[in-house]
Amino acid sequence: MASLNTPECPVMSSRPSMSCGNSSSSGLAIQGHSQRPSQTDPSAVEQAAQDSVIDLTNSDYETCDANRATKRQKLDLRIDVPNTQRAPKARFSQAVSSPFALQDTVPPIRTGRPFWDFGEEVSGFGFQGSLESEIPNDEPEQPDSLPPLPVRPWRYRPQGHSSREETPRVNQNAGAEVQTTPFCIEVPEAAPIFDSGKPLDFYPWKGDHPEDSLTDQTAKQGYYDRVQVSQNESNTARPSLYVQLKHRSGLKLLSSVFTAAIDKRQSHCRVTGFSTFKPPPRVTLTDIKRETWLRDLANPSVPLRRLSRTIPHGIRGRILLDQCVNKAIPIGRAVWLVKCVGANEIRAFKRKGTSAAITHSLEVKWVRDWSINVHQFIESVVTACGTPNWASTMSYVIRFAARLFQEQLLDQALCLDWFLQSLRTAPIGTLPIWLSMLGAYWTSLVRYRKRGRPLAESLLEKLKTILSLEDSGPKKQIADRLSWLIKTFAESHPACFVLPLTWRTYKSTLTTCFCLHLSEDNRKIGALSNRNERIVKAEICRQSGRQSPSQQVICLLDSADSLNDMEILSSGCLNLHFDHGSLIMKILEWVSTSFRRGSARVYVAVRLLRKWRRAGMDTDNCIVNFLQQKADTPGFSPANIYHLVCELVRSQSFAVGKYLQWLMARGAVRNDAPMHPTVQLLAHLPRRKLPSHVWNLRNTLLTKAGFLLSSENQQILNTKRYIHHRLPEVITKPIAGDNEGLFTPSDLSNLNWTIKSEIGHWIREHVSLHRKRYLRTAPNHHNACAIEISALTPAQFFEIRDIIECLGDLSLLADILKHTSSSDNIIVLISAVDTLNYCADSFKAIGALSDLFKSALAGYAHVNKADVSIIELISSLLEVGMKLPGEIPVVAMLRRDLSHFDKKFTGAVSSPVSDHTGESVNIASPAFSEGLHQLLNSGSGMDEPNMNKIFDMLSRKLKQSKEPNASSHEIARHLSQLRVLNSDVFDRLMVKWIISTLKSSPRPHLLTFLPPLIGVGCVTFEAFFALIDRLLKSDSHRQSIQDVSGLRYEMINLLRKEIFYELGSIDLVSYRFKTTREEYITHHAYDALGLVNEALANVNPESTSNPPLVPLLCELIIQNLNAFGPEGAGRIVEEFPNCVDIIHQALDVLLGLKAQVGVQKTQSVVGLIDDLSLSYCLVKLRLLLDANPDGDAARSSIVDLLFRTAESDIRNGERRWLEVLNVLPVSAAHLIRQRAEREILSLSLISSSLTTFSSEEDALIYLCIVEELSYSIPDEFSPSSMGADLGDKMFLLLQKTVELANAKKGTDLESGASSTALGVAELSIGVWFFVLLRLVALHRSLVPPNCDSRTEINHQTRLLVQICCISRSPLFARRSTQSFISSISTFTKCDSLLRMLPSSWANLQLQALDVCSTLVDTLSDEARYECARFLRDKCPAFLHPQNDARLLFLFGPIIESQSITTHGSSRASTSTPVTNLTQHVQSTPPPSQNTLTPGMVEEPNLFTNKLRFQQNGRITGPYPPKPWEMLGDAAPIIGINDTPVNLAYFGTRQSKRL
C-alpha cells in the first residue's frame, strides 16, 4: 500500500514515504524451454532482451501495495534472466495536476477478472525490423567470401559467439558418471513446441509414422506434410469481398470475422489458461478458530493460499473493520478479506427465482450500508482523539479507507458527499485529520464542479475561521498549510473558485493565500476576481471606484486638515488633473454655496488665490467669469464672493482697474433692477488702498447703474453714530447728527462690504488710539523690558467684539485681539481666548491663530494667579491649544497648571472657620457677590454642608431670575467657582436641583436659568438632554413633569441661533453659551436632529406658538449631510420620520425651490445636482418619491425622469446618477431596473445599418443601469416572465448565429462588402451575447435550488443548452485569439461602456462557461443529466460533453444505466427545454475534427471503461466489472512467494506460440 504521506500531498506530514512494491496478478506464467543456460552469453541475452522487450505486464492494474493479496503463479525458476530495470511507461508519464499524489497514476490491479479484448493494448506492440535482425546467428563464422548459412527457424534464443582464442582442452569424460539406466529418447531443448505441448517436427522412430515407411516418392522427393493447394490464388479477393459487404448482413459477417480473429489472437497469446477461481466460501467456526484464522491473516508469512479455502462466517460490517484495526491486518490482506466477504454477500442475493432488478437493488443497498458503516467507523475513530494508540489507529484507518475507495469497494457518490459534509462541519481541532484524508478523494472531488465548488467553499470557510482566531503556533501552521492547499487548488482548478453566491464572503480570505507583491500571483488572483465579478450582483450603495477631479477638490477643501497647512492644500489641488481655470471656478463655487457652513472657507480661498496669483494665474478673470455664469444658479450666495474680493483688494491681489475696464468694454453697467452680480460687486469694493481716479470711476459706474452714493455715505454716518453710542469711552470724537433711527446689530450684517470695510478700519483706528491713550506699563519678571498693558475693560471688549462679528470682518478682529491679549484684566483675557476658540477655523484660515494663541499665553504669564478665575482662563487656553497640532508641549504645560490650581482650591480644611463659612455669606446683603467672591478666592476649602448651604442660596437666586441678565450670569460664574472646590458633591447637587426645577409648578422657562449654567460649564447640552431623556422614559418621573411637549420645544429653542439676540448683551457667559451651542451643532447634529424628531412626534410643527424651526433644520441638515455624505440621505429620512415635513421646507429653502409640485419639482431637483448639492438633492428626491402625492402616475413619472437621467449620464461618461439611485429606496431602483430590462428585450438583435451599432450601444447602456441596480433583484425566487423572455431572446441569438455560420460558408469572402457585412454581424452577435449573459448571471435566482416547478426548470435548462451551443459555435473558434474591445470600440467612444466588455473573444467564451456554472449549481442531477444527454444525442459531435473537458466539468458524467432503463421517459423529456433548437444546432459545422471517443465516464483513464454491452450488434452501454469479483486465483504450487511477480522486473519479451 502506498503511503499517504507523499511529497505531493499538501496536507500530509513530512515523514518519509513507505517504499512501494509493484506486483502483478495478471495471471500470466512463463514456460521456459529446455535450452541449457551454459550455451548462452549473459551479455548477449541482456542486450537482446533490452532490444526486443514486449512488456506483457504493462496493464492498467498495477498496484503500489507490497502486501497485494493475490495467489501465487507458476514460475520456472530455472530461467536465468538478468534483473534489468523496467522501462518507464510513457502512457502514464504526464504530470498530475492534483496537489495530492496518494497513489500511482496506474489504477490498482484486479485479478480474477472476466476476459476482455486486449486489442488496443497489444496493437501497439510488435517486432520492428526483420526477423534476422532480431535473432542472432549461432553458426560459426564463415570466411568473408562465402555467404552466411540460413538461420534455423527454431533458433530463437541468441547463441554465444565462439572465442577466437584457443582454450586448453579438458577431458570432459574425466570423472564422468557411468549411466546405469537404459537410454531414453529426449526431446531437443531448442525444438519449438505446439500449444498442445508436443514438439514441432520431432518424431522418434516407432514404425507407425508415415515418414518411417520408405516409398518411391519419399525416396525421390523426401517427406513433407504440407497441404496441397488445388490452385494458386493469383487474383485479388476484392470482388468477392465487395459482394459480401454489399449484402445486408455483410457488416455483421465482417464483424463476426474480426471478433473471431480477435478471440483467436487473445487465446493464442495467453500464457496460462482462463481462470476458474471462485471466491472462497464462508463456514461457521468457533471463536477460537476464528481468532486463529484472523491472526494468520494478520501474519504476512502465512500464505493466503491456505487461508483462501474458507473464511469465517459472521465477520461483516463494523465487526470486520474492528478486527482489521485491532489485529493490524496488512492493508492488502484486509482488502482481500473485504472482497471475499462482499462477494459472498452479493452472491447470496443471486438465488434462484430472484429477478435481476431485485438483485441489483439489494446489491446497491448492501454496498450503501457497507459504506455507511465505514463512514461511521471513521467518525468514531476521529472522535476518540487523545486515547492511547490513537495516532497509529487513525493512520491505519485513513490508509484502509483510502484503499477501499480506490478499489471502488465503497459507494463513490455517497463517500464523496459524506467527506464534503464532514469537512464542512469539522471543528478546527479535528481539521488536520480530515485534511489528511483529503488526498484519497482529491481527484474525484475536483474532477467535476458538482463537488469541486463545495470543496473550495469549505476550505475557504475553514481558513476564514482560523484567521479570525487569536494567533498561536498550531493555528499558524494549519493556516499556512491550508493557504498553500487553497492556492494550489485555485491555480490548478480555477473553475471551482467561480463562486456566484459566496464570492464577496470569501474574496478577502482567498486573497490572503496569494502573495500580492508577486506579479504572477497578482495576475492569477486578478483573473479569478474578474471572472467572479462578471457573474455577481452589484453591492447596494456601491460608490464609484474613482472620483472625478472636481470631487477630489471638494474633498480636499472639506477636510479638517485643509486649515492647518495651506502649502499642502495648494499643492494637493494643483497636483490634480484639473486645469487652473476650472480649479479656481470650483473653489469659488465651494466658497459661494449655501450647502456649507462657516466663513473660514472665504479666507481659505483668499489665501489660495493670493498664492496662485503670485505664481502667474489669472485669478481676476476667473472671479468675474464666475459671477457672470453663476448669477442665477440656485444655492449661489454672492455675499461670500463679495467678501472674498474685498479681502483680495485689501491685499492688492485683485486688479480693480482691469475689472472696471471689463465692465465698460462689455457695456454691462445698466440701470437694471435687480443689479447683476458683476455690477453689484462695485458696491462692495473697499475704498482704502484704491487710487482716487479708480474710486471716482467706480462711483461713476455705480451712479450709471442707479446706485445712490448719498445713501452709502449716509449709512456710514449712521453706523458710526450707532457705534459711538455703544462705545463712548473708546470713540471719544463725537459724530454729527442725532441718535434717532439707530438700527439694530442685525442690520450691520446687511451692509455692503464697502461700508463694512470702512467701519472696521475706523473701529480699529480708535481702538489703537484708546490703547495709546490709556497705555500702562508693568515690570517684566522674565526680562528687563516693560510690558504694555491694554486698558480695555470687559464691557468695552464685549461691545467691540460683537460689532466686528456682526460686520463679519474677522481679519480686523484678529488685529484687535492682538491688542487685547496684553490686558491685565483676567476677564478680558478669558473673553479674548474664548473668541479665539469660537473663531478658530477662520483664524486658522487667516493664518493668525498660532500668533494670537502665543499672545494670549504671554498675557496668561503675567496675570494674577491668585484669582479663582485663573482656572477658567487655563480651560479656555486648553481648548484653543488642542486645536493647534504644533502646540502639544504648551497643552501639556497648561494641563499641569490646571491640575495644580485644582488641588489648590479644592483642599478641604476642617476648622472652626470652615464650619461657619456658609453663615458668613448673607444672600440678602448688598455685598453678597463681593463676599462670596472673597470666600471662593480665599483657598481655605469648603466642606459638604457649607457647599450645600451656598449652593442652595445661589440656586434660589438663579431661579428667581425672570430672564438672563448680568445678575444671573454672575450667579452662574459663582456656581462654576463653587464647583471647583468639590466637583463630585456639586454635580450631585446640580442634578437634584435640575430635576426638582423641572418638576416644579409652575416650571420656569429653560432660557431663564439653563444658558448661564451651560455657558459657565456647570451643565452641558449632552448631559442635560440625556437627563431629560432618562426622566421621560421613567414612568414615575414622567408623570410628575408637566407639559412634556412644551419642555421638548424649550429644549429645541435652546439650539436656535436667534436666541442670542433675545438674550441681550453678549458678555462672558453668553459668549461661552454661544460657543458651546456651536460645538454641539457641529459635533452632535445627529442627536440634535433626533431631539427635533421627538419634539415633533405629537405636536404640529406649524403651530404659531412654537418657535420657527426651519432655520435650525437648515443648519442641522447641512451639518449632518456634510458629515455623513450622500449615504446620509437615506439615513435621515428613515430615522427621523417626524421631521419629514419640516425637512421638506428646509430643503426648499436651501435649494431655492419655488412652489412647484410633482414632476416639475423633481425635474428642478435633478437639475440642481452637482458635487456640492448632491446630498441635499438626494434627500429631496427620496422625500418626493416616498410622498407620492399623485399616486402611481406621479411615481411612474419620477421613475421615468430618473431613468432618462441615468441614460444621459452614462452616455456622457458620468456616474452621478448612480449616487442618486443608490440612496433612493430599493423599490425605486427596482422600477428603474425593470424599465431598463424591458428596453433591452425590446431592442432588435441586428442593427439595420452595417456601419452603426445603435441598438448594441443602447443595449450596453441599459445593461449598465441593470448592473448597477442589480442589488434590487431579490435573492429569493419570485415567479416572473424574465426566464421565458431571456430564453426567447437567447434562442433568437442562436438562430442568428447559425444563420451567420451558414451564410459565411456560402459567401465569397473575397468580396469586400460581404466580408464587412459578415464582420459587423459577428460583432453584433458578440455584443448581444455578452449582454444576455450578464442578464442571465444577474437573474440567477430565476430558479432556486431544488425547485419543483417543471416550467421554471425548463427555462433554465433551455438557457443552459443555448449558451453552450453559442459559446461552442465556429464564431468563437475562429476569433478565439482576437481582441474584443478593439473591434467594438468603433461604435462607441464611452470609456465606461468599453470597460465593462471582455478584452477578447476567448474571455467572452470563458464568461459564458462561468454563467453556465451559475445555472448548473442550482440544477438537480436529473436536470443536469438531461442537458448533457441532449447535447450528446441531438447536437453535433463538437457539442458532446465528452468531447469538451469544460462541458464535462460542468455537467459531469452521464449515467448510462439510467439512460438505458429509462430510455423512453428521458427521450420524451429532453425535447421539452429545447423546442425547435435541434434543427439549428445540427446545421452548425464543428470547429475542429479532433473529437474524443464517445462515452462519459467517471474515471477516463481506467481500462475497464472501454468495455461495452452489445445488443443486436449495437453498443448499448458500458460494462463495468464488479470490483467485488476482482479476486486473484489460487496458486497451483507451493513456493516461497505468495503473490505473483511482475514480469517487467525481468525484462521478458513476448514469445510467439504456434
UniProtKB/Swiss-Prot annotation:
Bias type Polar residues, positions: 32-42
Any one GO biological process: regulation of transcription by RNA polymerase II
Record field: compositional bias (Low complexity): 13-26
GO cellular component assignments: mediator complex
This protein's UniProt keywords: Activator, Nucleus, Repressor, Transcription, Transcription regulation
Subunit note: Component of the SRB8-11 complex, which itself associates with the Mediator complex.
Protein name, entry field: Mediator of RNA polymerase II transcription subunit 12
Organism listed in the record: Coccidioides immitis (strain RS)
Lineage: Eukaryota, Fungi, Dikarya, Ascomycota, Pezizomycotina
Gene it is expressed from: SRB8
